[in-house]
From Swiss-Prot:
InterPro entries: GHMP_kinase_C_dom, GHMP_kinase_C_sf, GHMP_kinase_N_dom, Ribosomal_Su5_D2-typ_SF, Ribsml_uS5_D2-typ_fold_subgr, SK_arc. Pfam families: GHMP_kinases_C, GHMP_kinases_N. This is Shikimate kinase. The keyword Acyltransferase does not apply. The gene is aroK.
Length: 293
């Protein structure tokens, strides 16, 4: 008998990158990653595939399935397949979304449930074990799974605050990729005292100033161009940042700012695409093939 599970989780944008201080903040965005799991007692290994990258590294999604099966003492094998609307290695939390969707789809397949934060922590553990993240990305994982705006303590894997928000989001996603595990941690740690100031702004609910300060700090530390941020500020945008460790930029925008900022970013000269989306508040879901949750 084959057990099947299906789930999706969302991407996220950065308010505070946690690499400098282990404290982070992020917001869910309405770009999805889907996972399909098929399991059987006749199989003994988990084999993963990523639709957009046939030769891509599948250790994360495979490890997520293995950890769920281990949690419930199940000896099953099979396949895990993911596909995504989120640009890979762009700072938009594609790994967190893939981990969350993989864990949730596996739970769906085996008919088990876990509390939301335990699901998130299992995906974070898988990400740490296979080396795709520096801090464990607990902030990104919470934003991806829970939706809304989250503030976290990544070192202790604590969710400090979550609230819903309503905003359009404009993203500039360069064609080049930047893998989180390759980022310059030493230079990021140099800016820790100033990132701490941005984190305090986030705790006070001043998310736009927090993310903009975060963006200038990390662009400086990691060598990314601040022109995209300055163009956003020229358009009247209050909240814009390098997302994650780059190379994407994300801005919280009003409806009447979308066209102007899109044009400003497209005229900057870097190859890439502008994505228009919004903050997602609803969080990850599992569903049957017909799409019912």
């Amino acid at each position: 008998m084959t057990l099947e599970g299906h789930a999706c989780a969302f991407g996220a944008g950065t308010i505070i990158n946690a690499i400098a201080t282990w404290k982070g903040a992020a917001f869910g965005i309405d770009l999805k990653t889907f996972a399909d799991v098929e399991l059987s007692e006749s199989e003994s290994v988990i084999t993963g595939s990523i639709k957009e990258v046939p030769e891509g590294d599948t250790r994360l999604i495979e490890r997520c399935v293995e950890l769920v099966l281990g949690r419930f003492g199940l000896e099953l094998g099979g396949t895990i397949r993911t596909w995504s609307e989120i640009p890979l290695a762009g700072g938009l939390k594609s790994s967190s979304a893939a981990a969350n969707a993989s864990v949730l789809a596996t739970l769906h397949a085996v008919g088990e449930t876990m509390p939301s934060l335990e699901i998130i922590k299992l995906g974070v553990r898988a990400a740490k074990e296979v080396g795709v993240t520096v801090t464990g990305a607990f902030d990104d994982a919470c934003a991806s799974f829970l939706g809304g705006i989250v503030i976290t303590d990544n070192r202790n894997m604590k969710l400090i605050k979550r609230e819903e928000a309503d905003s359009r989001v404009l993203i500039f996603a360069p064609s080049k990729k930047a893998f989180s595990a390759d980022t310059n941690v030493k230079r990021s740690r140099l800016i820790a005292p100033y990132v701490e100031m941005a984190y305090e702004l986030a705790l006070a609910g001043d998310y736009e100033r927090a993310m903009t300060l975060n963006g200038f700090l990390y662009c400086g530390a990691l060598g990314f161009d601040t022109e995209y941020m300055l163009r956003a500020l020229e358009c009247g945008v209050k909240g814009v940042s390098l997302s994650g460790t780059g190379p994407s930029y994300a801005a919280l925008v009003k409806a009447d700012q979308v066209k102007e900022l899109k044009s400003a970013w497209e005229s900057c000269g870097m190859e890439g695409r502008v994505i228009e989306t919004s903050i997602n508040n609803s969080g990850a879901i599992s569903f049957n093939r017909e799409g019912s949750s």
